[in-house]
Amino acid sequence: MRRRDVMKLGALLLLDACTQRPADPPSGQVAVAPGLTLVMPSPASLNRRIEVSQLVVARYRTQTIAFEARISAAQDHFDLLCIDTLGREAMGIHWTSNGILAKKAPWVPENLRPENMLADIVMLYWPEAVVAGALAPSGGTLVAEPGIRSIRLRDKEVIHAEFQPPPGADPWNGKVRYRNLPLDYALDIQSRVLAP
């Protein structure tokens, strides 16, 4: 092979390596921050039946969007329906022990992944022991204090959540401010339980 051909081949291999995105985590896991995955628990591990309405304001860098979410959860399923401010169905998610089924409107950005929406909900509202166990395989830890959840990787906070219901109150009733520091997004969520 001539030197010129070797250089072309090397350049093509380098270009290919630079344009490939990181591998997706193994099945059943969701990347929630660089180097941190959440092993998705079962919907049953929420350990309650609940119907919730939420108003969500999401901020990503300079963009802000608002939407309404309706949640229905029981031992055998977790359903999430997202509706935009014009009343259009943006996304529907049905999660069971068999997996996640999602339907997105064509205008919803491709990088808005149902698995990540569910992972955010799990990290906010699932029992502390379940969240801690789901983060542990990738080295993540949960530090929980009254009104605060902090998720850390190698002693550095990567996710921070502040709950505004009174300490001891149901976190599904009230406000929460959630920040994913390395991915540079924040969620302000106002929740109201419709049926326990």
What do these predicted regions represent?
Residues 18-32:
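Bacterial Sec signal peptide processing site at the extreme N-terminus
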Residues 139-196:
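Gly/Pro-enriched, hydrophobic low-complexity segments
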